[in-house]
């Protein structure tokens, strides 16, 4: 039996401490809590304080005063009935007990890193990396199972583990609706959007828009927007979530740990390209599933299964909560996904309609996701990968959301803290500490070895997400921005530029760490979803109309995109200027911020973009047949339109063919003129000219 599961009476016989000594042992931060608990149940509090004193004394004798082995003493009594007191840590304000990793945990971590490096290096040798397609699209030779695993691993980063569990602890299961909407969106990608992308022979999403609408305004705008989202939103969220585990569980300097992770991640991203990313994602998907399912089993066992969770969640209140305040109370609709359309945190019309547009953007037009599907060897394997990812999308409700709710039941004084001052002491965030729910479970209830496995899971989620961002951002920069600067760049130059850009991303990520630390939200997942609702719907509408309406043209798409993004940026700035007040504060924000839910605003942005794009397209010249053929759903089977070519070389005047070489390009002819006394292919003597 573990030490924290011993009966309180045994502890009292062993410790020989009086009630008053136990109270004093609790320390000044707990004096008010001790007094309240003593008034309610002196006997229970007496035994708890004795247990507290013994745990501290035992830990002090082992580690010289460091509480490196503390665990919640009340886990063994969680199933004793509704009248059981909430579980109490040795220090209710200590969110992360300072325990050191044991040999088993370190062994698991070392084996994990060695295995990941071995798989990454193996994939660099196995796959072709000397061509642009081989590096950025894995040679188009991936089978369905690594594609599906990579889709899931790219989507489920450390931000999901921390964010979904935190939102589950704070508000219940409704946040899982994002996962269920994504389940359908990934299928829409494979069956509707992907056939269009394959028919159009595109590598990146800005490239599709360039072919579909022509011009450079839309592709360039979206390429910059995508890089902005990747660098300052995705990386920042994943790094913040991963930093919670790295800094607290490994007790390493944040910059040192982050730099090491980014260096390993960039190593096999730079050397191996997309193939290395997909194979390592497949490995890390297995690790994530095994670790998360294991923690789920421990979590449900601690509260008596799903039935115990439904009973105890509504009584999981912080002991320091004011009785006259509604702050910190669990939501009455915590176990409902579809909630009130006006007063709830996630209204059901917003879930069905407002949530759909950001989801379609992410799964059907985001470079990170689409690039993995384009790497499949054919459309059938791409569909198989999407089906696999769709099945896996059912699991986050049980692997992340519900364990977060369990964490609130087990640790209400920390996860469900309601007083801003107490929350500041617990997690450094006066808005709330729900985001520590998942790390709390890992560090408190798992035994040696499994704790190391779960840390490896979080590292796997962080690295898989970062590799996806690094590779896809490198692809966009190289193929859509660098190609515009140097249209005649060789494949070798494009490969070098892509790898150098990954290094710049690594440097930018490290420099962004202070911003991550200073931008904590009360609910990380909801915070990032609100930003997505302000920036992504206009882009999704442009892609949807471009794929399904042949009349849509460049002017309509550009102005629809500009108006949508402008309104979204205004709302985003208003959210920063007027942040959501704490529960105990009066809400004095403008009505457009306070009363219009971000999911409803997503619907407004979609409607505005749709109307502007349709009106401008009807009022201007329709697109040419070349911009429609094989680039919409209805024209994807059209014959390939051959561009007009110049006259063949054999029809050139003999005098020109005798002077060097001639190459036809469109309506022009490029000549390499070589003096008679020099070798014909000597580049130092060639002169280029163009006949129009």
What are these regions (language model features)?
Residues 38-43, 56, 62, 69-71:
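Basic polycationic patches enriched in arginine
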Residues 16-17, 24-25, 38-39, 73:
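Intrinsically disordered, low-complexity polyampholyte segments enriched for Lys and acidic residues
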Residues 2, 49-54, 69-692:
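Membrane-embedded helix-loop-helix hairpins and adjacent transmembrane boundary segments
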Residues 27, 40-42, 48:
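N-terminal leader/targeting signatures
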Residues 4-7, 19-21, 35:
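Low-complexity, intrinsically disordered or signal/transmembrane-proximal segments
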């Amino acid at each position: 039996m573990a030490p924290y599961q011993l009966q309180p009476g045994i502890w009292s016989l062993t410790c020989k401490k009086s009630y008053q000594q136990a109270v004093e042992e609790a320390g000044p931060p707990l004096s008010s809590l001790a007094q309240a608990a003593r008034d309610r149940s002196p006997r229970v509090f007496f035994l708890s304080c004795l247990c507290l004193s013994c745990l501290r004394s035992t830990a002090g004798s082992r580690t010289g005063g460091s509480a490196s082995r503390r665990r919640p003493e009340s886990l063994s009594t969680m199933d004793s009935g509704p009248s059981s007191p909430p579980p109490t840590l040795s220090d209710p304000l200590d969110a992360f007990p300072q325990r050191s990793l044991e040999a088993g945990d370190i062994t698991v971590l070392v084996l994990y890193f060695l295995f990941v490096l071995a798989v990454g290096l193996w994939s660099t040798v196995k796959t072709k990396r000397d061509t642009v397609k081989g590096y950025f699209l894995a040679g188009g030779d991936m089978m369905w199972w690594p594609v599906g695993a990579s889709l899931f691993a790219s989507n489920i980063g450390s931000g999901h583990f921390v964010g979904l569990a935190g939102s589950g602890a704070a508000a219940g299961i409704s946040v899982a609706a994002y996962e269920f909407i994504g389940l359908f969106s990934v299928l829409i990608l494979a069956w509707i959007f992907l056939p269009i992308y394959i028919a159009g022979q595109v590598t990146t999403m800005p490239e599709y828009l360039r072919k579909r609408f022509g011009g450079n305004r839309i592709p360039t705008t979206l390429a910059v927007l995508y890089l902005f989202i990747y660098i300052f939103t995705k990386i920042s969220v994943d790094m913040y979530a991963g930093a919670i585990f790295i800094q607290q569980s490994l007790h390493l300097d944040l910059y040192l740990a982050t730099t090491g992770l980014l260096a390993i991640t960039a190593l096999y991203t730079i050397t191996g390209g997309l193939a290395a990313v997909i194979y390592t994602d497949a490995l890390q998907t297995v690790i994530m599933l095994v670790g998360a399912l294991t923690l789920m089993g421990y979590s449900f066992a601690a509260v008596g299964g799903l039935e115990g969770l439904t009973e105890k969640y509504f009584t999981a209140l912080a002991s320091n909560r004011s009785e006259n305040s509604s702050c910190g109370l669990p939501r009455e609709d915590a176990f409902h996904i579809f909630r009130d359309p006006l007063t709830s945190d996630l209204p059901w019309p917003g879930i069905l309609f407002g949530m759909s547009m950001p989801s379609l953007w992410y799964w059907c037009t985001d470079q990170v996701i689409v690039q993995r599907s384009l790497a499949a060897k054919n459309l059938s394997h791409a569909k198989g990968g999407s089906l696999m990812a769709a099945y896996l999308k059912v699991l986050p409700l049980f692997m992340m959301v519900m364990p977060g709710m369990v964490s609130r039941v087990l640790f209400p004084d920390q996860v469900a803290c309601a007083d801003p001052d107490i929350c500041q002491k617990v997690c450094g965030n006066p808005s709330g500490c729900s985001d520590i729910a998942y790390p709390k479970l890992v560090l408190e209830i798992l035994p040696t070895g499994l704790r190391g496995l779960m840390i490896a899971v979080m590292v796997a989620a962080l690295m898989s997400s970062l590799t996806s961002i690094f590779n896809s951002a490198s692809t966009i920069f190289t193929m859509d921005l660098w190609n515009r600067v140097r249209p005649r760049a060789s494949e070798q130059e494009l490969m070098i530029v892509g790898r150098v850009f990954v290094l710049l991303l690594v440097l930018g990520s490290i420099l962004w760490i202070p911003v991550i630390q200073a931008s904590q939200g009360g609910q990380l997942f909801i915070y990032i979803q609100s930003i997505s609702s302000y920036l992504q719907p206009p882009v999704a509408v442009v892609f949807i109309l471009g794929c399904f309406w042949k009349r849509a043209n460049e002017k309509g798409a550009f102005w629809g995109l500009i108006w949508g993004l402008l309104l979204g940026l205004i709302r985003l700035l208003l959210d920063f200027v007027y942040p959501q007040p704490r529960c105990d504060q009066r809400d004095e924000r403008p009505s457009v911020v306070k009363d219009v839910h971000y999911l409803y605003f997503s619907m407004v942005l979609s409607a505005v973009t749709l109307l502007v794009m349709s009106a401008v397209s009807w009022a201007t010249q329709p697109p040419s047949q070349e911009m429609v053929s094989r680039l919409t759903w209805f024209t994807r089977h059209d014959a390939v339109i051959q561009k007009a070519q110049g006259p063949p070389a054999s029809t050139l005047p003999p005098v020109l063919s005798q002077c060097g070489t001639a190459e036809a390009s469109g309506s022009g002819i490029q000549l390499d003129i070589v003096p008679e006394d020099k070798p014909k292919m000597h580049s130092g003597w060639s002169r280029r000219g163009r006949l129009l």
